[in-house]
Swiss-Prot record:
Belongs to the prokaryotic molybdopterin-containing oxidoreductase family. NasA/NapA/NarB subfamily. CDD domains: MopB_CT_Nitrate-R-NapA-like, MopB_Nitrate-R-NapA-like. Binds 1 [4Fe-4S] cluster. Binds 1 molybdenum-bis(molybdopterin guanine dinucleotide) (Mo-bis-MGD) cofactor per subunit. It is found in: Periplasm. Its main location: periplasm. InterPro entries: Asp_de-COase-like_dom_sf (IPR009010), CT_Nitrate-R-NapA-like (IPR041957), MoPterin_dinucl-bd_dom (IPR006657), Mopterin_OxRdtase (IPR006656), Mopterin_OxRdtase_4Fe-4S_dom (IPR006963), MopterinOxRdtase_cofactor_BS (IPR027467), Periplasm_NO3_reductase_lsu (IPR010051), Prok_molybdopt-oxidoreductase (IPR050123). This is Periplasmic nitrate reductase. Residues 1-30 form the signal peptide.
Length: 830
C-alpha cells in the first residue's frame, strides 16, 4: 500500500518530471529528478497568498519559476497546497506585467491629467521627491503618508516604518491589515496586553471541538481546514460548530450549524458566558489566579466622519476604548439580560442550538479551539467580539494548552510578521510598542541611532482616515505599496477615489500589474514580486519564514525595499527635521536619510560576502551590504527580552520557520503557560505577562446594533468576502488562466425565494444598489454559498464589478477596522 507521504513524494516527482519534459513510465518514484539532468534548481519559500504560511518548493529554470509543489518538510502544510498554491508558478508571468516606471505627462511634463508615459527611475524619483519636498515644506509631515501591506516582507515594512516615522517624522503610515487584522490586535492588547495568538496549529490535532466564528476556513484557510477535517473524521467524538450569517462550505462538516442575524454574534457570546456561570462550570481556580474583570465603554459610535449623525449621538465616541474595573458579581449581573428568549429572537438561532454550543465551552472535559477571521474582525464591534470570545476561554480555563485555544486566523501572508510585529500601523512601533508611550519612541530612537524627539508622539492617520484626508486635501503626498486600495476600500466612490484624483495630491503606486489603484495614480513604480527578491513572512501561528531571491524581476522592476531605500537618498535631514533637533545633534546636519537610517553602522554592518553565493540578492548587490540581514538584526533588537524574541537571521534560512518567542534557540508553541513559554515564572502555572499583574481581563461588553440595517427602501443585507480561487482583489490570481477560468466573474449569491420575489433566475443580470453606489452582476442561487432570505453575498475580487461602490465606511471605533460585512442594499432586475 502506498502511504500518504509516498504519494506526496511521487506527486512531487511527477511535477519535476513534467516540467523538465520527461515522459513518465512506471512508478513516479523512479523518475530522474537530479538537477544535473533536469536543470531545475529547487528551493523553499512560504506561499505568497494567505496567512496560513504553507511552505512550497520552487523550481527555477533559465531565470523563471517553472513549477511549485507543497513542501513535505513543512510542519504547516505537510506537502499539501490549496488550488492557489498549486498555481504559484504562474502569478508572476501575466502578459501585462509592469516593467518600467510610468508617469502622467502632458507636453513632456508631469501633469495630473496627463497620460501614463514611460520614464527612467531617476526621473520618477526626481518628480516624486519634488512633490514630497513641496508638501513637507508647505504643510509639514502630517501631509505625507503611506499605505502599505500585510504582504510586505518583514524588512520592507521595517524600512518603510523607519523612512516615515523617523525620516519624514510622519506616523501617517498604515497597512491594509487595518482592513483585516486591526480588531484582532486591539482585542489581544485589551485582554492580554500583548499581541498575537497564544496557541499554534498543533492545537488542531488535540482539540475535541472546533467553533468557527465568521470564518470560512474551507476556502480562506483550506490547508488548515484539511487538518480540522482529518481530526473530525478520524476521531468520532470531535465536534465542529460553524456560526455564520450565511451557509458556506464549512457547513458540510458542521455537527452544529448556526446561521445568525448579522451583529447578533455579540449577544450569542454573552449568552454562552451566562450559561457557563449558570451551570456552575466556571474554572474558579484559574479565574481566581489569572483573571480580573472590567466594564468597557458602551455607545461608542461607528467610526464614521465626526459630523455623521451616528457619531454625534454616541455618548462615548471620543473614548471608545475606555474601561473601568469591575468584579465577577457585576459581570454576572450584566449577563442576565442575555437570556435564551432575547438572544434567540435577536439572532434567529434556537435555544437548543445555543445550549449545545454553550455546552462545548462549558464541559471541562472538552478541549475547545475557536477560530475566527473577517466575520469577527470586519465588524463595527470587532474588538468586542475578540474580547468576548476570550471571555469564554478564560472563564473555563481553556487557553494556552494543547487543544484549548482562542485562535485569530490571519488573512495575509505577513499581516502578523510585518504589519503587526514590525508595527507598520499608524500608532505602533515594532514588538507591540506604540508612539504614544514616551519610553517606546525613546527606545526606537536609541536603536536607530537618531536624535531624541524625532519620532512624533501622536498616532497618524489610519487607513479609512487616510482616504478621508486625501479627499479633503489634508494628505497630499502619498505612496501605496503591495495593495489595491481603490478596489478594496469601502465606499470607494465617495471616500477613496476622489482623494486619489484630487488635483492637490500626488499619488504614487508601486505595483506589479495594472490595477484599479494604479490607474488612479500619478506615478506607477514597477515592483518585484515574491521570489524575485529575498524575503520573510510571519504567519498566523507566530512562525517566521525566510526565502532567497530565486529569479530576477523583469525589465526595470525593483523590490519595494529597493524603492524605499533608494528614495531615501533624495532627502537630507535639513529638509525633513526641524532646526531644534538638528541644533542639539549637529552631527546629523546635511546627511541623507539613507545615511542616517540605512548606512548607520547597524543596518549596513553585514558584508555581501555573507550572502549564499548560490543565490542572487539584487538589493544587497546594489547597496553594497547584506541589506536583509542588517535590517532584520536591527529590528530583532526590539523584541528580544520583550516577549517577541526572534532567532538569529541565518537560522531562518535553514529552518522551515520558527515560532516566536525563540529563546535559547527553542521556539514556543503555547504562550503564557509554564513549561512552554520561557517568560512564565516558575510556579505561576499561567502568566499573562502582557499586563503588569500577569492577569488577563474579562470584559463586560453589550450587544449594540450595526451602523446600517435593512429597511423598507434597502431591504437586504450585503455581505462581501472572498472565494477560494482568488486572492483579495484578483490582481494576481485572475492572471492565472486556470484560476480565472474556474471563477471568471463575481456573482451575487442569494436565496432562491428572494430571486423569485424579484423575478430573476440564476444567471440573470441584477443591480446591487446602496445609498452610496451601485454595481451590476449576475444572480447565483446555487453553489457554494447559500445565504438566508434577506441577505446577499458578493465577492470583491472582480475589478469589473466593484462591490465596494456599495459598502459603508463604518469602522470599529477602537481598532479603526472597516465593517465589510453589514450594510443595506436593494436589488433591481436589469
Amino acid at each position: 500500500m502506498t502511504t500518504r507521504r509516498e504519494f506526496i513524494k511521487r506527486s512531487a516527482a511527477v511535477t519535476a518530471a513534467c516540467t523538465a519534459g520527461i515522459s513518465l513510465s512506471g512508478e513516479a518514484s523512479n523518475v530522474i529528478t537530479d538537477s544535473e539532468y533536469t536543470r531545475l534548481k529547487w528551493s523553499k519559500a512560504p506561499c505568497r497568498f494567505c496567512g496560513t504560511g504553507c511552505s512550497v518548493n520552487v523550481a527555477v529554470k533559465d531565470n523563471q519559476v517553472v513549477a511549485t509543489h507543497g513542501d513535505i518538510q513543512s510542519e504547516v502544510n505537510r506537502g499539501l497546497n490549496c488550488v492557489k498554491g498549486y498555481f504559484l508558478s504562474k502569478i508572476m508571468y501575466g502578459k501585462d506585467r509592469l516593467t518600467q516606471p510610468l508617469l502622467r505627462k502632458k507636453n513632456g511634463e508631469y501633469h495630473k491629467d496627463g497620460d501614463f508615459t514611460p520614464v527612467t527611475w531617476d526621473e520618477a524619483f526626481d518628480v516624486m521627491a519634488k512633490q514630497f519636498k513641496k508638501t513637507l515644506k508647505e504643510k509639514g509631515p502630517t501631509a505625507v503618508g503611506m499605505f502599505g501591506s500585510g504582504q510586505w516582507t518583514v524588512w520592507e515594512g521595517y524600512a518603510a516604518v523607519k523612512l516615515y516615522k523617523a525620516g519624514f517624522r510622519s506616523n501617517n503610515i498604515d497597512p491594509n491589515a487595518r482592513h483585516c487584522m486591526a480588531s484582532a490586535v486591539a482585542g489581544f492588547m485589551r485582554t492580554f496586553g500583548i499581541d498575537e495568538p497564544m496557541g499554534c496549529y498543533d492545537d488542531i490535532e488535540h482539540a475535541d471541538a472546533f467553533v468557527l466564528w465568521g470564518s470560512n476556513m474551507a476556502e480562506m484557510h483550506p490547508i488548515l481546514w484539511t487538518r480540522v477535517t482529518d481530526r473530525r473524521l478520524s476521531h468520532p467524538h470531535v465536534k465542529v460548530a460553524v456560526l455564520s450569517t450565511f451557509q458556506h462550505r464549512c457547513f458540510d462538516l458542521a455537527d452544529l450549524p448556526i446561521i445568525f442575524t448579522p451583529q447578533a454574534d455579540l449577544a450569542i457570546l454573552n449568552y454562552i458566558a451566562r450559561y457557563i456561570i449558570e451551570k456552575d462550570m466556571v474554572n474558579w481556580d484559574f479565574v481566581n489566579k489569572h483573571v480580573r474583570f472590567k466594564v468597557g465603554a458602551a455607545d461608542i459610535g461607528y467610526g464614521l466622519r465626526p459630523e455623521h449623525q451616528l457619531e454625534l449621538a454616541a455618548a462615548n465616541a471620543s473614548n471608545p476604548g475606555g474601561a473601568k474595573d469591575s468584579s465577577f458579581e457585576e459581570y454576572k449581573n450584566f449577563l442576565q439580560q442575555y437570556d435564551a428568549q432575547f438572544v434567540s429572537k435577536l439572532s434567529g438561532a434556537s435555544k437548543e442550538k445555543l445550549d449545545q454550543l454553550a455546552e462545548l465551552y462549558a464541559n471541562p472535559k472538552t478541549r475547545v479551539t475557536s477560530f475566527w477571521t473577517m466575520g469577527f474582525n470586519q465588524h463595527t464591534r470587532g474588538v468586542w467580539c475578540n474580547n468576548l470570545v476570550y471571555n469564554l476561554h478564560l472563564l473555563t480555563g481553556k487557553i494556552s494548552s494543547p487543544g484549548n485555544s482562542p485562535f485569530s486566523l490571519t488573512g495575509q501572508p505577513s499581516a502578523c510578521g510585518t504589519a503587526r510585529e514590525v508595527g507598520t500601523f499608524a500608532h505602533r512601533l515594532p514588538a507591540d510598542m506604540v508612539v504614544t508611550n514616551p519610553k517606546h519612541p525613546e527606545f526606537a530612537e536609541k536603536t536607530w541611532k537618531i536624535p531624541p524627539g524625532v519620532i512624533p508622539d501622536k498616532p497618524g492617520y489610519h487607513a479609512v482616515l487616510q482616504n478621508r484626508k486625501l479627499r479633503d486635501g489634508e494628505l497630499n503626498a502619498y505612496w501605496v505599496q503591495v495593495n489595491n486600495n481603490v478596489q478594496a476600500a469601502p465606499n470607494m466612490l465617495e471616500e477613496t477615489l476622489p482623494g486619489y484624483r484630487n488635483p492637490n495630491n500626488f499619488i504614487v503606486v508601486s505595483e506589479a500589474y495594472p490595477t484599479v489603484t494604479s490607474q488612479a495614480a500619478d506615478l506607477i513604480l514597477p515592483a518585484a514580486m515574491w521570489v524575485e527578491k529575498e524575503g520573510a513572512y510571519g504567519n498566523a501561528e507566530r512562525r517566521t519564514q525566510f526565502w532567497r531571491q530565486l529569479v530576477s524581476a523583469p525589465g526595470e522592476a525593483k523590490s519595494d525595499l529597493w524603492q524605499i531605500m533608494e528614495f531615501s537618498k533624495r532627502f537630507t535631514t535639513d529638509e525633513v527635521w526641524p532646526e531644534e533637533i538638528l541644533s542639539k545633534s549637529p552631527e546629523f546636519k546635511g546627511k541623507s536619510l539613507f545615511d542616517v537610517l540605512f548606512a548607520n553602522n547597524s543596518v549596513n554592518k553585514y558584508s555581501i560576502e555573507e550572502i549564499d553565493p548560490n543565490y542572487k540578492n539584487h538589493e544587497s548587490e546594489h547597496f553594497g551590504f547584506y541589506v536583509q540581514k542588517g535590517l532584520f538584526e536591527e529590528y530583532a533588537i526590539f523584541g528580544r527580552g520583550h516577549g517577541h524574541d526572534l532567532a538569529e537571521f541565518d537560522r531562518y534560512h535553514e529552518a522551515r520557520g520558527l515560532r516566536w518567542p525563540v529563546v535559547d534557540g527553542k521556539e514556543t508553541l503555547w504562550r503564557f503557560r509554564e513549561g512552554s513559554d520561557p517568560y512564565v515564572k516558575k510556579g505561576a502555572g499561567y502568566q499573562f505577562y502582557g499586563h503588569s499583574d500577569g492577569k488577563a481581563i474579562i470584559f463586560a461588553l453589550p450587544y449594540e446594533p450595526p451602523a446600517e440595517s435593512p429597511d423598507q427602501d434597502y431591504p437586504y443585507w450585503l455581505v462581501t468576502g472572498r472565494v477560494l480561487e482568488h486572492w483579495h482583489s484578483g490582481s494576481m490570481t485572475q492572471r492565472v488562466p486556470e484560476l480565472y477560468l474556474a471563477v471568471p466573474d463575481a456573482l451575487v449569491y442569494m436565496h432562491p425565494d428572494d430571486a423569485r420575489k424579484l423575478g430573476v433566475r440564476r444567471g440573470d443580470e441584477i443591480k446591487v444598489v446602496s445609498r452610496r453606489g451601485e454595481m451590476r452582476s449576475r444572480v447565483e442561487t446555487r453553489g457554494r454559498n447559500k445565504p438566508p432570505v434577506g441577505l446577499v453575498f458578493v465577492p470583491w475580487f472582480d475589478a469589473s464589478q466593484l462591490i465596494n461602490k456599495c459598502t459603508l465606511d463604518a469602522t470599529d471605533p477602537i481598532s479603526k477596522q472597516t465593517d465589510f460585512k453589514k450594510c443595506a442594499v436593494k436589488l433591481i432586475k436589469v
